[in-house]
């Protein structure tokens, strides 16, 4: 029973001395007494290599490299193990989660948090922490008895003690945790003869838990000798750099005193690890109070980059230089990091430079497609077949792998499901998934081609196969009563899915193609899944449980699964975190992410027990728990010290000025401290360095081409670029080995986001030999030619979702007003309040179920919206009644369609126009309402267009002149052409072109006292005043509002009279009959010009800017055209907005005779 302590700063030969001792013993007596080297889990492989790679060792049976848990197993093999089953991490958390749910109603502080998955994880960690520090439920109950304890802390401890006690009772005599196994190991030590003759070495630790100290105590007491290696100078000052390992030394001294033995200390002061004076000086002076500055010889570098990505790119380039120019091997290099954001960058950047590497971290399995499928399957059942988990399940491609182009089929199914609002048991309704229904996707019904029909039949078959599998799973699970039944049902369902065979086939293919790591992942996925099922049966067995609870507990277990990354080669760069990675004696170590906030890192308490409570327990009960945040904060300098002293040749520190989320970052204060130790240690700003040394960017062929592209792009933008890049371009271009992909990159240099003119032949292929279109299509072209090309040429459509859009509201209002108008023959003035409500209810009952597959009855929100729609309609009808009371014009026709060849007698004929290429233009559409008034054998017509959007309920004559607003003039033209079909007189003249804004008006009052019901009603009615353009003919004026008289402005039409009876300029929007005809004729010419441009093949990204507004703000195709307001302003078209459109139209000559039948 002897105790040795090797003490010294980093790199002073402590571990080397230990390894030398062990090797000498192995050489002298290969079969002698056992030698046990205890190290952290992440260090065991490295230490085993140290023995295996020694050519002087021909093998030995006496030395083992173990961590504490493996050592306990070694003892158990000798003296016998515990009879209880050991709980895995996943099994422990599943059990605790179930206990929490059962005991939720008894909890005082955590009752509301108990339902969340994360709470059971926190509670499991806290119980494990208590076990590590030998705190039992009885200890907690004794703490609770303290009357001076705060109520919140008391309630917290009562809750934790309740779960902890219940957990201990559940596992008593049946199960054992990892911490309990270590306690059993301590009890078994006296029985081990193997241990009594063993020499124990403990290396690589900087701190221990209470239970680990008890193990060390037992080893010292029962082993032949124990040697512990600590990185410390022996200073017990709590503010010392070596506070943490010195704290370990203090505990070891206490153990030695308890056992009444002395510690044979051996101090190591001579530095051996470092090959140069730079690293020696860095290690010796890092914690010095009085700085001794020396000249830096170039073995320490500090790099400053603009972004984290550029930082890792530079590290990759420097590793290539290390390998190529400095003859290092990849295994001589290590990268240490602390910010988790860097892990993704390593995976995405290092493979681009063909650098082999191994990251010493465990990745969660939850994002693997198989696990995502299983968890989504669970959520489908839990959520009663909601759409999001169903789509996630489908997109994993695990259950649909047998289908060709399964991802495309799932995309089509997703479009259909989102449009029709499929959720819940509607997934099971085969009628909803009839192939014919797919012809109506995107609101545009069309006849299916044979290929489309075959594709949609595949979609339906795929959906049916997946649904059958889910139904089988649901049925199997619903028949289970105990946890064992559920686990069996789940496994049998996976076999029904043929998942085992599918995974094994995929694994073999990956192995065959050289993707060994991916193949290994599949093995681990399946083994992990089976392990969770085994754990469930082990922990709960025949215990009754609801399916809902089983799925919750099972999901908790799946969350605990992690991939164990097995190194694929020995020669690779080691990557790990600064806190945990064990890399020693590397020729070059890169410490990345050296920013303030990362190194040092603000330490915040994350456990259920706060720092204050930990201190309270230590003071009141002498119970030591895991270190508090302030203690951990003091150890940040030691973390930095250990990380930077792992190298023996070179250390490179790096940091970026911008974080992963775009936030500004500052340099670590430790780097300032390091820089102060040297006279010539400058921070290398990478952008400036690369500008001066462009060759430093040319380390890897593929990546050099990408950097070359960036340099040439800058050169084309008239920026100054080093001649080296132009030389590099010529070398790469002329080299058959290097120039692959160069042409593709260079083509991007001249890319300017310009579209190509289609030409007449291709335009005919796209648009047909005649244009059959609505007015809105031509208006869309005027907004932007590319928008028209994308929508009508490429036929790109936004995914239609099961939700109400603005245009849906417009359609509803149109349909409801048509229904009511036809019921009363357009006589709105006969309506009273009772009739309005009756008709509104009838119309809504008839129309709303047809909207978006009965969307407005799908939820409480939409049912509320339906009532709002009814209220708007009632207000609108009141306004129409008011307007009809004072107008001689009578509504006669509603929702009147027009086209070149009418299908019914009620439809109107639209005159065919012709493009300059001779292509027929067939305009079609629908006029909301036509009002007529006849006097002296002359009929006057009003065009009334309902608009639910205020912005579109205005007739802008400037827009009309430039062809941006073509609707109203087209409608009036159609009506004038169809006097006989409309039953009008031989003479027909325009009355008004008017918009009616269907909306819910808002009236503002300063206070409640100002509200007058009568005035409120009048103000509301005035909000519905028609806007647009009116024929200045006196007959029309008099008929529009019979109340018109001098000094009166109508509140129903845009007309007002001056004192002398003339039309007022401010209150009237009028034009004479000839002007209206000229606008109509000019509108036709705009049609012809627009259609001719379409057939010419114009597809320019050229939005029309009007009144400082762009159509891009509401365009669905921005992701296609990539127009950018910052750099593409030259693309914008403009018009002369200063013109007076009335005066401008006077120059238009009328060629056609208006009022004639076509």
Swiss-Prot record:
Cofactor: Mg(2+); [4Fe-4S] cluster
Binding site for [4Fe-4S] cluster: 784, 1112, 1115, 1121
Gene Ontology molecular functions: 4 iron, 4 sulfur cluster binding; 5'-3' exonuclease activity; ATP binding; double-stranded DNA binding; helicase activity; metal ion binding
One of the GO biological process terms: double-strand break repair via homologous recombination
Binding site for ATP: 8-15
E.C. code: 3.1.-.-
Enzyme class, first EC level, given as a word: hydrolase
Function: The heterodimer acts as both an ATP-dependent DNA helicase and an ATP-dependent, dual-direction single-stranded exonuclease. Recognizes the chi site generating a DNA molecule suitable for the initiation of homologous recombination. The AddB subunit has 5' -> 3' nuclease activity but not helicase activity.
Similarity section: Belongs to the helicase family. AddB/RexB type 1 subfamily.
Quaternary structure and interacting proteins, as annotated: Heterodimer of AddA and AddB.
Name of the molecule in the record: ATP-dependent helicase/deoxyribonuclease subunit B
Organism of provenance: Staphylococcus aureus (strain bovine RF122 / ET3-1)
